[in-house]
């Protein structure tokens, strides 16, 4: 049969619809906040991506960290949390209002002396997502990511913005991996 030939050539890439739906129906819905949960149908589902957008100081980081605290609870699987501190602005103020956050268990990725490129941040995030099932990946913020070319070129150099293309390719590359890993990716703008 065609299916057997495809499986022989590509591996177990064909499954029945009932298998897929059964697997997906077991995905947990994790609450974010009462107001957002109403709009989201109860919260964020494992294996999804979400973008938090809003004005500066509107609570995007705090909301993401509160969601991380919920994910760390036993009720929601004691999920590992990785926080990409792209802006380098994670402060105790962000953490103080977050009930139940286990800060000692969060892995914070951020530049030290030298700035890190968008490619470095995205590669690190990809590695964590691929190797850490059920993780929560917070990228704060995607608008602060700087492609390597822009980091090394002169400020006056003429070039086309490459961040949208980088993000598009990164999302495409991880599109099937995030659901398989039951990861949740939160990107703050």
Annotated model-derived regions:
Residues 84-85, 109-111, 186-189:
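Conserved beta-strand segments of the P-loop GTPase G domain that flank and frequently precede/overlap
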Residues 114-189:
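P-loop NTPase motor core
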Residues 1-108, 117-118, 122-130:
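The Walker A/P-loop phosphate-binding site
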